[in-house]
Amino acid sequence: MEALVYTFLLVSTLGIIFFAIFFREPPKVPTKKAK
């Protein structure tokens, strides 16, 4: 049970980091295209 909770926490943290990076990258592309 503890292992499951730890895995869920790890996946959640990884997902949040991945989402933050994915959301931060796209804005850089349109900015370059606008210029």
Swiss-Prot record:
> How is this protein situated with respect to the membrane?
Single-pass membrane protein
Q: Does the keyword Plastid apply?
A: yes
Quick one: a GO biological-process term for this protein?
A: photosynthesis
Would I find Transmembrane among this entry's keywords?
A: yes
Query: Which InterPro entries does the annotation name?
Result: PSII_PsbT (IPR001743), PSII_PsbT_sf (IPR037268)
Disulphide bonds annotated for this chain are: none
Annotated transmembrane regions: 3-23
Family annotation (Pfam families): PsbT
As for family, the record states:
Belongs to the PsbT family.
Q: What does this protein do?
A: Found at the monomer-monomer interface of the photosystem II (PS II) dimer, plays a role in assembly and dimerization of PSII. PSII is a light-driven water plastoquinone oxidoreductase, using light energy to abstract electrons from H(2)O, generating a proton gradient subsequently used for ATP formation.
Assembly and interaction partners: PSII is composed of 1 copy each of membrane proteins PsbA, PsbB, PsbC, PsbD, PsbE, PsbF, PsbH, PsbI, PsbJ, PsbK, PsbL, PsbM, PsbT, PsbY, PsbZ, Psb30/Ycf12, at least 3 peripheral proteins of the oxygen-evolving complex and a large number of cofactors. It forms dimeric complexes.
Stated name of the protein: Photosystem II reaction center protein T
- Phylogenetic placement of the source organism: Eukaryota, Viridiplantae, Streptophyta, Embryophyta, Tracheophyta
As recorded in Swiss-Prot or TrEMBL, the protein's gene is named psbT
